[in-house]
Design a protein with these regions (language model features):
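Generic structural signal for buried aliphatic residues
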Residues: 55, 61-62, 285
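N-terminal, Lys/Arg-enriched amphipathic/low-complexity engagement segments
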Residues: 1-48, 63, 213
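Short coil-to-beta-strand transition motifs
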Residues: 69-77
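Buried, small/hydrophobic-residue-enriched core segments of structured protein domains
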Residues: 70, 84-287, 291-451
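Short histidine-centered loop motifs in beta-beta connectors
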Residues: 44-54, 58
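Short, solvent-exposed loop/turn positions at domain surfaces
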Residues: 43, 49, 66-69, 273
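Conserved "cap/hinge" positions at secondary-structure junctions
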Residues: 59, 64-66, 84
Length: 451
């Protein structure tokens, strides 16, 4: 019997253009693919290939400089065409020109039921997939020398315009279960699902403890689920795994090969059709997004969802943890008479400033990317706590991070948060602070202090 956890705090933001599972987005065959190290938070990449080298799918393109046994696999076989670098020689991406006929390194099929935790770790390390596992504290890609007290997988994606994992799960049920079984060999594994998710592969998942979350966004955040099930204290570590990565792990054990195909949602009001595209990690966005845009001007293209995603361009690629590509109006061409004072029904407000609240919570809004105000002092108390379903004082924690008071941060629970946990709080924040950026900087400083 699943444990049902009801959450009252949070905020559902219904945006126009949610992806339909019945719409298949065509994908143009790309000549080049690229692996982007920035998708793996906390990893300093050390490139282990040279331009002109030939790699198979599954061969390492770079390793974690701090932990060289953690490799990162090429999504395709082909010739390494470029190692792009930015300021201070930061590695931006490694490009691979795909072969006409793809070849994969064979790591050998494995029966996960017969493996122990050490063997599972070793298999993931050899195949270049271990880096897809994140950890709390610090919300970074983990390393094999950490010993997790538990592993958390959240199959609930409830951010605005987020992809429905049940669409991606269809046809991958066996791989998903195999991945869960493999993780359960390392530590006790918790699977979090939503009250409206009815897939048998989720409801009848084996070798995991199933928890059903009933509440508004961000109930699907794995950090929120950790906070309600097994909070992280100083000195403790939990691993968190994206559900798409669980499928990658399962495929590895079932086939012996690295297969990084995933279904990515194409969503937002600026898309002609909102649906799902079957792509590889590293696929250029131009191969499947460009043809779907209504226009290329006054549009905010986002690698991810509007709350936690990153502003991007057609020159970017599908990231390791990307589950949706969204497009919303930029808002730089708007000219509104009387501004926010004008009564209206098409604007979203958490404080009932507009008449739109009369239409109920299910009304969809076509919001743009404007902040509508400048950064200012933190005067409104309690705003964060209304939408943060965690047993922490969010406002005081943010102030402690800004002040650089590490002792106070530890007392207020910084070890169990991720930047995405403050995404909804950032949306409602009348002070217009970049809360996710503040949290990330605080976690990075704390990680360096504790190294």
């Amino acid at each position: 019997m699943a444990n049902v956890i009801k959450l009252r705090k949070g905020l559902d933001i219904n945006l126009t253009g949610k992806a339909s599972k019945d719409v298949a987005i065509p994908v143009v065959q790309a000549a080049e693919y690229a692996l982007v190290p920035a998708a793996f938070e906390g990893v300093t990449p050390k490139v282990v290939v040279r331009e002109g080298d030939h790699v198979n799918a599954g061969d390492a393109l770079f390793v974690n400089k701090a932990c060289p046994e953690v490799k990162f696999a090429s999504p395709v076989s082909g010739q390494v065409t470029a190692i792009e670098r930015g300021e201070r020689r930061k590695v931006l991406c490694i490009k691979v020109k795909a072969d006409a006929e793809q070849t994969s390194t064979d790591f050998g099929k494995k029966n996960v039921d017969a493996l122990d935790g050490a063997a599972v770790k070793q298999a993931l390390l050899e195949a270049g997939l271990f880096g897809y596992i994140n950890q709390l504290p610090y919300a970074v890609s983990t390393t094999p020398d950490t010993t997790p007290k538990a592993i958390f997988v959240s199959a609930l994606r409830d951010m605005p315009l987020a992809a429905d994992f049940e669409v991606e799960l269809e046809g991958n049920e066996q791989a998903f279960q195999t991945g869960l079984t493999a993780l359960s060999k390392i530590a006790k594994t918790y699977l979090g699902v939503g009250v409206d998710q009815h897939s048998n592969a989720l409801g009848e998942a084996k070798n995991v403890e199933l928890n059903v979350f009933d509440g508004p966004c961000p109930a699907g955040n794995v950090g929120v689920q950790v906070n309600h099930i097994d909070p992280v204290n100083k000195g403790e570590v939990v691993w968190t795994v994206d559900p798409a990565s669980v499928i990658f792990f399962g495929r590895l054990f079932l086939t012996g090969k690295v297969d990084l195909h995933k279904k990515v949602a194409i969503a937002g009001s600026e898309m002609k059709k909102a649906g799902y595209a079957n792509v590889l990690v590293g696929t250029p966005l131009a191969a499947f997004v460009e043809a779907q845009l209504k226009t290329t001007s006054h549009v905010r293209l986002i690698n991810g969802n509007p709350l936690t995603g990153v502003k991007t361009t057609m020159a970017d690629y599908v990231g390791a943890h990307t589950s949706e590509i969204t497009a919303i109006p930029e808002g730089d061409d708007c000219d509104e008479m009387l501004g926010w004072i004008l009564p209206r029904t098409n604007q979203f407000s958490t404080s009932r400033s507009y008449l739109s609240w009369l239409f109920g919570k299910n009304k969809e809004y076509n919001l743009d990317a404007r902040i509508k105000g400048g950064e200012r002092h933190m005067i409104m108390s309690g705003e964060y706590d209304q939408v943060l379903p965690m047993d922490i004082f969010g406002e005081y924690l943010i102030k402690a991070i800004i002040a650089g008071d590490i002792d106070k941060q530890e007392q207020l629970g910084i070890y169990e948060i991720s930047p995405e946990d403050f995404a909804v709080a950032e949306f409602v924040d009348s002070s217009k602070l970049e809360l996710q950026k503040i949290v990330r900087q605080g976690l990075n400083i704390l990680r360096k202090e504790n190294a």
